[in-house]
Design a protein with these regions (language model features):
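Short alpha-helix boundary/capping elements
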Residues: 33-36, 96-101, 159
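GST superfamily/GST-like fold recognition
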Residues: 25, 81-116, 123, 137
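GST-like domain detector, emphasizing the conserved glutathione-binding G-site
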Residues: 1-64, 76, 81
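Surface-exposed helix-capping loop/turn segments at secondary-structure junctions
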Residues: 72-84, 140-148
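Preference for well-ordered, secondary-structure-rich cores of eukaryotic proteins
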Residues: 10, 15, 38, 48, ...
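Alpha-helical packing segments of well-folded alpha/beta enzyme cores
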Residues: 59-70, 96, 130-134
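N-terminal DNA-binding recognition helix of tyrosine site-specific recombinases/integrases
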Residues: 133-141
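C-terminal/domain-terminus segments
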Residues: 144-160
Length: 160
């Protein structure tokens, strides 16, 4: 992902406009990778019916750390994570949160095992800037055709 963004930087500056922005983007990609590790373990365990208290707790903590950091980065009311335009950090964030929303499809399984959903109904109140940014990205013209139907499908499972 990083290499592709660097190759096209003259046309699409997804890796920032200077070394400072590139460094910030790298930081977001690194924390996204840490979150992705625990979220993938969690989502795979959910799909296999093997989620346990340890896996659930690690994913819950990973999400809280990730979302808290993003919430702080988006303060005060930034429209993007780095710089003044969409960057690789925003793309990665949108992809990670959309993938994590697959938890919605396993709400019944979580309930049967006595676990609450990590992306519970009030999570948007806990991280308002994160979810406002995600909503902006879903409606971004280059994301909308693919991301919006995917997220809507997952949200419909949460409502069910």
């Amino acid at each position: 992902m990083r290499a592709v963004a660097r190759l096209g930087e003259a046309t699409f500056p997804l890796y920032g406009r200077d070394v400072y922005e590139a460094s910030r983007i790298d930081s977001f990609l690194d924390v996204s990778l840490v979150f992705a590790r625990d979220s993938q373990i969690y989502l795979l365990a959910l799909s296999d019916g093997a989620v346990d208290a340890t896996i659930h707790a690690r994913a819950k903590q990973a999400f809280a750390i990730y979302a808290s950091g993003l919430e702080q980065a988006l303060s005060p009311r930034r429209d993007t994570l780095v710089g003044n335009g969409i960057s690789l950090a925003d793309i990665c964030f949108a992809a990670e949160l959309a993938l994590f929303m697959n938890e919605h499809a396993r709400a019944e399984q979580l309930s049967e095992r006595g676990f609450d959903r990590i992306l519970h109904a009030g999570v948007q109140d806990d991280y308002p800037l994160v979810f406002a940014h995600f909503a902006r990205l879903i409606d971004y013209e280059h994301f909308r055709p693919d991301l919006k139907p995917y997220v809507e499908k997952l949200l419909s499972k949460a409502a069910a």
